[in-house]
């Protein structure tokens, strides 16, 4: 249990963020991970996390002009914003040690699938990102102390919300990055 839970919101003016008290919340969860080397060349890994985080005492009262308090919002039982219920990573690596006199010393292929969701963006739980995942890969070509890497992030160009906020009675969503491709050159001294 968390007492004096605090969350961040945009100020009513829309200028800047403020931290507000959100009463109490309860969070529990579990996680597991596994890594296996199937051969000298091939290794696999997986991890999973589950979190259940809800408000247990979060009521917003409003005072009328006569000084009477009325319940403006009751968030008890609602999921705490920005906490993914599930996280998942599945990946693998295949490393080839090349023969002497080859151009490369080693060639390594890596791929992983990262996923998260459902993520609620508001205390009302009226805006959320469903469970989603991105596929990423990398191919490394190693020569002595040098390495050339070809890589892709969000290879399948999954459309998802990376962030959401509300200000001045409007909602704004930041989309996740689209598919990205690149080349890295590294040299160790």
Each language-model region and where it sits:
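A short beta-strand motif that forms part of the nucleic acid-binding face
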Residues: 1, 11, 50, 152-156
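Residue-level signal for pocket-adjacent positions within structured domains
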Residues: 2, 15-17, 75, 155-156, ...
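Membrane-topology and secretion signals of cell-surface/extracellular proteins
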Residues: 3-21, 26, 33
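Residue-level detector of intrinsically disordered/flexible regions characterized by low predicted structural confidence
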Residues: 5-8, 23, 63, 138, ...
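Generic structural "secondary-structure junction" signal
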Residues: 9-12, 22-24, 44, 82, ...
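Gram-negative outer-membrane beta-barrel transporters
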Residues: 20-122, 186
């Amino acid at each position: 249990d968390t007492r004096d839970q605090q969350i961040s919101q945009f100020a009513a003016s829309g200028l800047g963020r403020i931290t507000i008290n959100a009463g109490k919340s309860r969070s529990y969860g579990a996680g597991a991970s596994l890594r296996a080397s199937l051969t000298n060349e091939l290794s696999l890994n997986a991890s999973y996390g589950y979190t259940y985080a809800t408000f247990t005492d979060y009521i917003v009262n409003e005072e009328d002009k006569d000084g009477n308090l009325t319940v403006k919002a009751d968030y008890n039982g609602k999921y705490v914003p920005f906490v993914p219920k599930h996280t998942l990573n599945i990946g693998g690596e295949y490393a080839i040690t090349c023969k002497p006199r080859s151009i490369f010393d080693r060639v390594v292929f890596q791929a992983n699938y990262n996923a998260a969701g459902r993520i609620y963006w508001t205390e009302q739980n009226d805006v959320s990102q469903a469970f989603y995942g991105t596929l990423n890969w990398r191919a490394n070509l190693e020569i002595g102390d040098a390495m050339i890497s070809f890589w892709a992030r969000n290879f399948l160009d999954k459309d998802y919300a990376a962030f959401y906020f509300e200000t001045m009675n409007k909602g704004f969503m930041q989309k996740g990055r689209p598919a990205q491709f690149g080349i890295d050159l590294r040299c160790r001294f």
